[in-house]
């Protein structure tokens, strides 16, 4: 990406609105030096903090003092934005900051910064790539230590490095494939060379690995959608109340009490979860209940995880060695998308004093399933479920963490994965080098969108407009 010259100077408050001990106003652009001369009466030394009065240069004698504080000057290109930057660090009173900002905006060719415009300047001047710019907003908005660590890793370039490595591998393979197409007269059939297939499969494996990491990063950022499903009167609403810590749902002994979707956002050790209670799944002639069941399946199909609840006081056979979980509820598993993870919740452990906690059950085909026995009524065993959900989300209590990812990153990685699989199929089935080369070109374009090497102006506007002003 080439650096884009900025002709406009922007200014905004860089600290949060409201009262505080310190308030910072940032100015970036070619007029920053003139603003410093007008407000400070001098241009501070580069990267040297100076304690100076902030003058109202719009007053009659131009010497009226608005505030006094620290002034910092960063000379282009060695600044956050890549432009000349001056920061005024004064007292954090809203009135004082508004007065100072008004004087700054009165200077020629200085305008109010839009949300995210400082970060956009940094991106356009190659100081940050797009994932790093997004990580700034994610770091500010992080709701847990895990999210903050992941956002910081993205800001430091961990995600970008993985993407760039995949792009380099694809470019290298493209060169090899296109050379084979351009020089068909060579005695060696390069397209039939096992090296191409081997390298292509290695890239596919790498993309799949990064995609899984990105899915974890997306869950940490956006929260995991957990849907509680099961037959009527299994205790789904009681579990929602137990997880949320409040009486969100009405609980009765009457089967079918819940007829619509109930949602509650909770945090477990700072990790965001969207818990969704649904109507009991059964055949029904009741029009309202049927609508509720349809909505339940809509939520199940959009879930990151499904908690399938059963009544442990009634259903014992599902844990026998010769049973499969799918045999227990075949009509449910027949409709459940394979990509959605499932945890079996055996509720009402208090009825027969069953042992609570986490166990694993292995189907006859070797598939392992997580099973948690609990009592939503007494709360016993609910902590085991919370720990299980944390594990699924990739919670790490130490100082390590993955990287932050957004929905658009997942889409680009999924598209890349699908195009690579198409290219592999065309190569193995038809030795179709031209199609493989085109699929590789599309893959490179998809990955370049993640870091911003190839990005539409509309996407940039959408991304940076979600930032706070001053960033």
UniProtKB/Swiss-Prot annotation:
Enzyme class (EC, first level): hydrolase
Positions contributing to K(+) binding: 233, 252, 254, 257
Binding site for Mg(2+): 237, 258
Domain of life according to the entry: Bacteria
PANTHER family reported in the protein's UniProt record: TRNA MODIFICATION GTPASE GTPBP3, TRNA MODIFICATION GTPASE GTPBP3, MITOCHONDRIAL
Family: Belongs to the TRAFAC class TrmE-Era-EngA-EngB-Septin-like GTPase superfamily. TrmE GTPase family.
Physiological role: Exhibits a very high intrinsic GTPase hydrolysis rate. Involved in the addition of a carboxymethylaminomethyl (cmnm) group at the wobble position (U34) of certain tRNAs, forming tRNA-cmnm(5)s(2)U34.
Protein name as it appears in the record: tRNA modification GTPase MnmE
Organism name: Colwellia psychrerythraea (strain 34H / ATCC BAA-681)
Gene from which the chain derives: mnmE
């Amino acid at each position: 990406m080439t650096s884009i010259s900025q002709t406009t100077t922007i200014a905004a408050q860089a600290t949060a609105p409201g009262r505080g001990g310190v308030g910072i106003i940032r100015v970036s652009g070619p007029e920053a030096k003139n603003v410093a001369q007008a407000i400070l009466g001098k241009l501070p030394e580069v990267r040297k903090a100076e304690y100076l009065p902030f003058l109202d240069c719009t007053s009659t004698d131009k010497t009226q003092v608005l505030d006094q504080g620290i002034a910092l000057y960063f000379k282009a290109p060695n600044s956050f934005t890549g432009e000349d930057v001056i920061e005024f660090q004064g007292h954090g009173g809203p009135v004082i900051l508004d007065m100072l900002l008004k004087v700054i905006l009165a200077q020629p060719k200085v305008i109010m910064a839009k949300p995210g415009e400082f970060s956009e300047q940094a991106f356009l001047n190659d100081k940050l790539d797009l994932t790093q710019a997004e990580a700034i907003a994610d770091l500010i908005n992080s709701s847990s230590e895990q999210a903050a660590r992941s956002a910081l890793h993205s800001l430091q370039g961990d995600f970008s490095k993985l993407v760039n490595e995949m792009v380099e591998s694809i470019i290298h393979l493209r060169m090899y494939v296109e050379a084979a197409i351009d020089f068909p007269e060579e005695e060696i059939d390069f397209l039939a060379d096992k090296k191409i297939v081997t390298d292509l499969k290695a890239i596919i494996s790498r993309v799949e690995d990064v995609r899984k990491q990105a899915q974890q990063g997306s869950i940490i950022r956006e929260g995991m959608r957990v849907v509680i499903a099961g037959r009527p009167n299994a205790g789904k609403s009681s579990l929602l109340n137990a997880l949320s810590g409040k009486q969100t749902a009405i609980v009765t002994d009457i089967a079918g009490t819940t007829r619509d979707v109930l949602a509650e956002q909770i945090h477990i050790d700072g990790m965001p979860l969207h818990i969704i209670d649904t109507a009991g799944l059964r055949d029904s002639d009741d029009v309202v209940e049927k609508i509720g069941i349809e909505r339940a399946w809509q939520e199940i199909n959009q879930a990151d995880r499904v908690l399938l609840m059963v009544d442990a006081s009634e259903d014992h056979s599902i844990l026998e060695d010769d049973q499969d979980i799918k045999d227990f509820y075949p009509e449910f598993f027949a409709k459940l998308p394979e990509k959605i993870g499932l945890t079996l919740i055996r509720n009402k452990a208090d009825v027969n004093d069953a042992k609570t906690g986490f166990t694993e059950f292995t189907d006859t085909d070797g598939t392992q399933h997580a099973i948690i026995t609990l009592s939503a009524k007494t709360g016993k065993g609910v902590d085991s479920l919370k720990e299980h959900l944390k594990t699924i989300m990739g919670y790490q209590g130490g100082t390590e963490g993955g990287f932050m990812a957004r929905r658009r990153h997942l889409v680009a990685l999924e598209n890349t994965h699908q195009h690579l699989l198409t290219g592999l199929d065309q190569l193995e089935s038809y030795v179709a080098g031209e199609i493989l080369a085109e699929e590789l070109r599309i893959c490179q374009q998809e990955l370049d969108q993640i870091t911003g090497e190839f990005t539409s102006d509309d996407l940039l506007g959408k991304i940076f407009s979600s930032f706070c002003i001053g960033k």
